[in-house]
A protein has these predicted regions:
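Mid-domain alpha/beta scaffold segments of enzyme catalytic cores
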Residues: 1-131, 135, 194
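Catalytic pocket-lining loop regions of alpha/beta-barrel enzymes
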Residues: 111-112, 125-196
Length: 196
């Protein structure tokens, strides 16, 4: 069985526009436009899965502002009713009802949350982040973190391996945390130094 554990989809009405923005951002930051592998719709993901022999995909939505989480988590729950797809939930670390949102995510049967410190503009070792990480650990929710650089975002980088190490040493066990991109995209020496 082949499982793609880190995928992204968007509602059909915004998918094309969102992909254009993300691709454009990579061109601004990297000087080269990085093309998406699918059209970012659920149908596009399923088609890609069929073409590549992927049995199951896990979708990682990202709440990029404090007002999106209820819609994102409702769509995530709907995604989980489909064959072959599982979706995490999301919340924004600065939203006031973060704790209630985590309980809602748990109640909806979602496996965990996706946090993207670059898109959400928070440091992984900030108090706002740590309180969420601790609560997720308490609730038994997985946390997938974007770690290291993002090809479409200018520095500073908000989740470098050294910052994640501080969280693991002083705040959380990390047993429920998944550091995407091998612990720090394009920060491989720091991954080896702080996380291996």
């Amino acid at each position: 069985m082949i499982i793609d554990f880190h995928t992204h989809t968007f509602p059909e009405k915004i998918a094309e526009r969102t992909i254009d923005i993300l691709e454009s951002n990579t061109e601004k930051v990297q000087g080269v436009r990085s093309k998406a592998h699918t059209d970012a719709t659920v149908a596009g993901l399923l088609k890609s899965m069929d073409e590549c022999g992927v049995d199951i995909s896990v979708v990682m939505p990202i709440a990029t502002n404090t007002k999106q989480s209820s819609t994102i988590n409702r769509v995530a729950q709907e995604t989980n009713s489909r064959d072959r797809l599982f979706s995490f939930g999301s919340l924004h670390p600065m939203q006031e009802d973060w704790e209630k949102t985590l309980y809602d995510i748990k109640e909806k049967g979602l496996l965990g949350i996706k946090l993207h410190p670059e898109y959400q503009q928070f440091y992984i070792d900030s108090p706002e982040s740590v309180r969420i990480l601790k609560k997720c650990e308490e609730l038994g929710l997985l946390v997938t973190l974007h770690t290291g650089l993002d090809i479409g975002v200018f520095p500073p980088v908000h989740c470098m391996p050294e910052r994640l190490r501080r969280v693991l040493d002083y705040e959380c066990s990390g047993k429920n945390m998944i550091a995407a991109h091998m612990g720090g995209w394009r920060a491989w020496d720091d991954v080896e130094k702080y996380l291996v």
